[in-house]
């Protein structure tokens, strides 16, 4: 965000290129939790997709967060994302209303039916107040465009049950749980900490895929201070503060969030340093530095 609260699209483009070229991200989610999706307008969401697609070209896929607590609105956002050039959709469970399982299935099916894009379901009951049951996910796995799960349920047994009964691609949606999820069949992560330790996350994934569990475990343990630091407050707040510390697009947040305090920034500096993140010296700026918006 710019100082006056507007979306800085130039900053978003700069950050997108950094995440792909420097942090080795193979895909980007636009309008997710860290991108403050609840407080951006539909028009802003569309423009962000277009800007990020232009910035990364064919170097990474662009997935649009389109989930809301209104089915018809989510369907319209999905159609808008397809028109804007998104490569896929990420759809969080509808929040606040606490739908029953059959209603959740109907909600996700309506969105998946509305476009030709592949779709990931975001299961995060800590934010939505309702968890997706195993049988619900198994049933949804039969839809040809529902291809995977962003899993932030924090229940390895439940995740394992779905993995065992479906071909859904399971991505961790909680950074500290990535390695445990890989051990039961997960394939990757949709990450917050990849904003600062992307290459190390890639190295952990590669080590695990190569059967080098000790190396994967060491990467996992070495990143724990970063995981702690970026979640001491809401992820968008702390990630934007981290981007500012790195001389990258960060900027403010929209209410009801507040920016990180000076005390929080100081603690975050210590956390990142403990996690092996090299921060620019005071007054030193990256060539790509500018005020902007975290995706």
Q: What spans do the regions from the language model cover?
A:
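Active-site beta->alpha loop and helix N-cap motifs at the rims of alpha/beta catalytic domains
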Residues: 1-129, 137-139
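Residue-level signature of catalytic and energy-coupling elements of molecular machines
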Residues: 5, 149, 268
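A general structural signal for well-ordered alpha-helical segments in protein cores
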Residues: 12, 45, 49, 74, ...
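Positions that flank functional sites
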Residues: 35, 96-97, 126-127, 178, ...
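Short helix-capping segments at alpha-helix termini
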Residues: 54-60, 84-85, 115-117, 141-145, ...
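Helix N-cap/beta->alpha junction signal
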Residues: 70, 174-175, 261
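Catalytic alpha/beta core domains of metabolic enzymes, predominantly
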Residues: 113, 125-231
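Structured C-terminal cap/extension of enzyme domains
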Residues: 182-295
């Amino acid at each position: 965000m710019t100082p006056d609260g507007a979306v800085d699209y130039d900053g978003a483009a700069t950050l997108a290129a950094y995440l792909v070229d420097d942090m080795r991200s193979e895909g980007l989610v636009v309008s997710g939790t860290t991108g403050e999706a609840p407080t951006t307008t539909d028009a802003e969401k569309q423009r962000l997709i277009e800007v990020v697609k232009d910035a990364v070209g064919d170097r990474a896929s662009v997935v649009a967060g389109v989930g809301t607590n209104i089915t018809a609105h989510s369907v319209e956002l999905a159609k808008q994302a397809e028109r804007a050039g998104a490569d896929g959709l990420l759809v969080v469970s509808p929040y606040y209303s606490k739908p029953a399982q059959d209603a959740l299935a109907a909600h996700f099916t309506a969105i998946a039916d509305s476009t030709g894009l592949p779709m990931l379901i975001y299961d995060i009951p800590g934010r939505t107040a309702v968890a997706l049951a195993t049988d619900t996910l198994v049933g949804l796995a039969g839809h040809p465009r529902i291809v995977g799960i962003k899993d932030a349920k924090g229940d390895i047994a439940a995740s394992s049950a779905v993995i065992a009964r479906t071909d859904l691609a399971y991505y961790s949606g909680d950074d500290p749980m990535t390695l445990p999820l890989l051990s039961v069949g997960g394939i990757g992560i949709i990450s917050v900490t990849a904003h600062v330790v992307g290459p190390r996350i890639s190295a952990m994934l590669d080590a695990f895929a190569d059967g080098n569990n000790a190396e994967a475990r060491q990467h996992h343990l070495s990143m724990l201070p970063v995981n702690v630091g970026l979640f001491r407050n809401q992820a968008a707040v702390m990630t934007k503060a981290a981007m500012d510390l790195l001389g990258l697009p960060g900027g403010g947040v929209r209410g009801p969030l507040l920016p990180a305090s000076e005390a929080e920034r100081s603690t975050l500096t210590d956390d990142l340093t403990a996690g092996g993140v090299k921060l620019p010296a005071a007054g030193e700026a990256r060539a790509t530095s500018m005020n902007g918006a975290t995706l």
